Amino acid sequence: MTEGLEIIEVTGRRLFDSEGLPAVEAEVELENGARGRAMVALCENSGNTDQMMEVLSECVLFEDASDQRGVDKILEETASSVGTAKCGGFLTAVSMAVSRAAAAGLGMPLYRYLGGTAPGRLPVPMMTMISGGRYGRNNSLDMESYMVVPVGAASFREGAARCMEVYQALKRLLTISGHQTGVGEDGGFVPDLR
């Protein structure tokens, strides 16, 4: 076991996400004081969330946070013994919180902890511009999402800025064309483009 990275506490909380929907948060504390936190939306049939949080919290106590595969295996085995569908996203929240705590415990950024020391590419942001399908409540589009990906951006920040420029330009075009600029569940515009 890596010194100081033993999981000494896992706390679960019920929250609401940015849309006011139920979510769960896991917070993991390590022996060396490092912490990690993650929030995941709950599915509709999440069962007894409090019970799932308690069961999954206890199953990883005293495990080595730097052994992500081992922790995930324990979580999956525990979840399958009680019914994975009823775990309501808390399994994912615990797994993510363990990763973040391990990275903090080792004093490195999460991307470096997960990606290793070899130079790699940082993630490229993707942004939904127009929502359709089940996300576009007020339109008849068959596609669920029309997204932009800022390929070639020099940094994540530059990529996000490019996405926002396109988003704002699209909003102006929709307004000029007389379309609504309300947004759907995933943040994309939901104009009726029939």
Question: What does each model-identified segment do?
Answer:
Residues 1-22:
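Short, Gly/Pro- and small/polar-rich lid/capping loops
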Residues 15-26, 83-103, 124-141, 185-189:
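Conserved phosphate/anionic-ligand binding catalytic regions in large, soluble enzymes, centered on
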Residues 31-33:
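Glycine-centered tight beta-turn/hairpin loop motif at sheet-sheet or coil-to-beta transitions
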Residues 38-108, 160:
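Metal- or metallocofactor-binding catalytic centers and their adjacent structured scaffolds
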Residues 49, 120-184:
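Mobile "lid/hinge" segments at catalytic clefts and subdomain interfaces of large enzymes
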Residues 65-72, 86, 110-113, 171-188:
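Flexible, glycine/charged-enriched surface loops at secondary-structure junctions
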Residues 108-126:
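Glycine/threonine-rich beta-strand-loop-alpha-helix active-site module
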Residues 190-194:
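Short glycine/threonine-rich loop-to-helix capping motif typified by GTGT followed
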